[in-house]
Design a protein with these regions (language model features):
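Short loop/turn microsegments at loop-to-beta-strand junctions
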Residues: 7-10, 272, 394
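A short hydrophobic/small-residue beta-strand
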Residues: 157-159, 334, 417
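Rossmann-like NAD(P) dinucleotide-binding subdomain of oxidoreductase/dehydrogenase enzymes
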Residues: 110, 114-252, 377
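Short, well-ordered beta-strand elements within core beta-sheets of diverse protein domains
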Residues: 20-27, 42-48, 133, 242-244, ...
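Conserved C-terminal structural/oligomerization subdomain of aldehyde/semialdehyde dehydrogenase
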Residues: 14-23, 206, 243, 297, ...
Length: 463
């Protein structure tokens, strides 16, 4: 039996203590069929519900999230180890997401009219149907709602298959939808095995698929969706570059790098993983970064002042530790941490690796935990070349006083997002997604609303 599942149950283990939170029986084929039936039936009514009514329900969902914020945040912390202050912030961010789409989402579905020869034409955005969402554990509520809210405002229904170790969070979220007054079937939660996921993807009632997860999971889900000729959106990993040029404000850059690397105990897809520092400031940046990292409090994630909690699973900690060991054997310098913390729980010491080169493990692979890799660049052009020398392309950050230069460099960076003098973040006002092995498709902004829509051309009076 693994830490997160057996043949019959999804198992939730507290990563700070090793104690079991609970276990959740995998659903039968009949239960899965019933969930898909509810989602398909609900779609027929939900797509016809006036937009103002959908908006009203999203506003109610924001209220339901806030009403149980403490219970949901505590569940997140107990299931995957997120420090409680960050878990509370996740719930509030989700509430604001609901409110933002309640206000702005309907306009994103307005028809686009145009004059054409011999008549008039317009493009209408029609929902596709029930969307299957396979979601990860690192942001148990935000990752779900980031995709679900724009998908729902568009008129689709949503079937969530969550990670096995955060099923408690999934059920609390489902309860919030019920309290907000959403009709049955609009937001479904299924607890199934990988075989159950395959069954759902192949089922004709599922119109499309979205996944946030690993490259391996993305390839598997993408292949199955392709075999069924169904659209899919994949938000996969990232090994994001964080570029600091010689003229940058180092104090600001260091602060952003620390937050960008160590929030959520380093378990973030869009995070400052490869710190690419121009050689004129690499020594000073490194000194300040190590000192700032040393000040971070590691400990019980239920304590409000803890910044770094445990990693979500012991197997992930073992994998990270091996990546660090491999990088050190390849010639990197260990400046801080570099080992599993002693005692109970899946803790890993905040780690800083210096003298990392493009041939080393921590440069080539994604390190999903509290480990920063410092790489030296000769100049801005070399920094961009290093940034692009990756299988991933999620986000990138540039710190420099020369904003005009940064704007120029953005066109050279092979990523879905670029942040100038600020660390990467997801926000409903702008789209989110990657290129290369970071996936394809987009979430958030109007792109997220229309991602699972049929852009239908309506042509009138064509002669």
């Amino acid at each position: 039996m693994s830490q997160i599942s057996s043949q019959t149950h999804a198992i939730s283990i507290n990563p700070a203590t090793g104690e079991q939170n609970g276990h959740y029986a995998f659903e039968s084929a009949a239960a899965l069929d019933a969930a898909l039936t509810r989602a398909a039936f609900a779609f027929g009514k939900w797509k016809r519900k006036p937009l103002q009514d959908r908006s009203r329900l999203l506003t109610a969902l924001a209220g339901a999230l806030r009403e149980t914020s403490e219970a949901m945040a505590t569940m997140i912390t107990q299931e995957m180890g997120k420090p409680i202050a960050q878990a509370r912030g996740e719930i509030e961010k989700c509430a604001k997401l609901c409110e933002w789409y309640a206000e702005h989402g309907p306009a994103m579905l307005d028809a686009e009219a145009t004059q054409v020869e011999g008549g008039k034409a317009r493009i209408e955005y029609r929902p596709l149907g029930p969307i299957l969402a396979v979601m990860p554990w690192n942001f148990p509520i935000w990752q779900v709602l980031r995709g679900a809210v724009p998908t729902l405002i568009a008129g689709n229904t949503y079937v969530l298959k969550h990670a096995p170790n955060v099923m408690g969070s999934a059920y609390l979220l489902r309860d919030a939808f019920v309290r907000a007054g959403f009709p049955e079937g609009v937001f479904e939660v299924i607890n199934v095995t990988p075989e159950g996921v395959s069954t759902a993807i192949a089922d004709p009632r599922i119109a499309a698929v979205t996944l946030t997860g690993s490259v391996r999971a993305g390839m598997a889900i993408g292949a199955q969706a392709g075999a069924a000729l169904k659209k899919c959106v994949l938000e996969l990993g990232g090994s994001d570059p964080f570029i600091v040029l010689n003229d940058a404000d180092l104090d600001e850059a260091v602060h952003a790098a620390v937050v960008g690397r160590y929030q959520n105990s380093g378990q973030v897809c869009a995070a400052a993983k490869r710190l690419i520092i121009e050689e004129g400031v690499v020594e000073e940046f490194t000194r300040k970064f190590v000192e700032a990292t040393r000040q971070l409090k590691v400990g019980d994630p239920l304590n409000a002042d803890t910044y770094i909690g445990p990693m979500a699973r012991f197997d992930l900690r073992d994998e990270l530790d091996q990546q660090v060991r491999d990088t050190l054997e390849e010639g990197a310098t260990l400046l801080l941490g570099g080992r599993k913390a002693e005692g109970a729980g899946n803790f890993y010491e905040p780690t800083v690796l210096a003298d990392v080169t493009d041939r080393m493990t921590s440069f080539k692979q994604e390190l999903f935990g509290p480990v920063a890799s410092i790489i030296t660049a000769r100049d801005a052009a070399h920094a961009v070349a290093l940034a692009n020398d990756s299988d991933f392309g999620l986000t990138a950050t540039i710190y420099t006083a020369n904003v005009a230069l940064a704007e120029q460099l953005t066109s050279e960076l092979e990523t879905g997002g670029v942040f100038i003098n600020g660390y990467s973040a997801s926000d409903p006002r702008v789209t989110f997604g990657g290129v290369k092995k970071s996936g394809f498709g987009r979430e958030l902004s109007h792109f997220g609303v229309r991602e699972f829509c049929n852009a239908q051309t309506v042509w009138l009076d064509r002669k």
